[in-house]
């Protein structure tokens, strides 16, 4: 089995987990973060990180009724028309059963299976503080070596997380330019980088994503830089210019600390996407993780 197939298998197993914890701590966030770090050396993938993927993907029991639900909706009849507004309305009314049914109907009529899933991701972004981090990582996990037959499992995963709390009122649209460098000093670095990636993502719902993100960003406050030291770690400096195994080796030491792994992966994203003037700040944040 190839590296890509192995990782996708762990993703597929993870999203059918019976997970009852906080949405912002969902194991798929941890798994996709590890996958991104593994990508720094695909020719010699880290054994430690691959073993962690398998362990985390299988730590919760499976849901067994995803296909049964889809089959039942098909059996009952899809109907002559399927409206996106029906799914949105069911989410706003916190009507879990109807929400599953409308999402299943969209799944069944969609040529590529994406329509319902993308709408659910957009709906989740209305509660960006709670669901933004998960929405990004779940979206990327689904699109990694995408198979249409498995999309319903990812859709049901986000449905289960959405309904854990009532959604806030529909957010206002804000005319905002997302400047990553102006927001980089954040105490929500994982959420910030998820927002930036979703802002620039290739999606049929990109406009809707941006509208939800702009509302969150309008309330986001950048913090005072927490480090006075302007020194940059020498190995990190080499990575910033040439790539390499810098983040892989740090991740191996932090592998039993999911929160630190997710933050580390966010700092990796900043390394590759923020202005070089922030490298000392990023370096200091990385070093603070391993102290």
Which positions does each model-derived feature cover?
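Mature, well-folded catalytic/scaffold domains that follow N-terminal targeting or propeptide regions
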Residues: 1-291
